[in-house]
Structure formats: C-alpha cells, structure tokens
Swiss-Prot record:
The modification N-acetylmethionine is found at residue 1. It comes from Homo sapiens. This is Metallothionein-1G. The gene is MT1G. InterPro entries: Metalthion_dom_sf, Metalthion_dom_sf_vert, Metalthion_vert, Metalthion_vert_metal_BS. Monomer. Class I metallothioneins contain 2 metal-binding domains: four divalent ions are chelated within cluster A of the alpha domain and are coordinated via cysteinyl thiolate bridges to 11 cysteine ligands. Cluster B, the corresponding region within the beta domain, can ligate three divalent ions to 9 cysteines.
Amino acid sequence: MDPNCSCAAAGVSCTCASSCKCKECKCTSCKKSCCSCCPVGCAKCAQGCICKGASEKCSCCA
C-alpha cells in the first residue's frame, strides 16, 4: 500500500497502512498525529510543522 496513503479527496473511505505519513494522509482511517509532538487530531498539522523534541509540543499545535 502507498505509504503516503493519498486519497482522491479528503473524507474518502480507504485504509491506511501503519506507516502512512499523516502530514499527507487524507484517509479517515488514519488516526496518528502528524508528528511525534502533535496530538492526534491537530487541526493545523496539514500545514506542516517542525518538532524540536519528541516530548515538546510544536508551535502549530500550541
């Protein structure tokens, strides 16, 4: 399966592999955060973010 798990449009039903890159993943089944310091469901993750540390929240999710 495509590791980026890209769908034609957001909300399209499909299955993501555990290795999907959620920054680009538009699948509803993908529940992972976009990066290690962002909580699942971070609304701004699609804009991209840079994590300073695994346990530190990035500015986009603050």
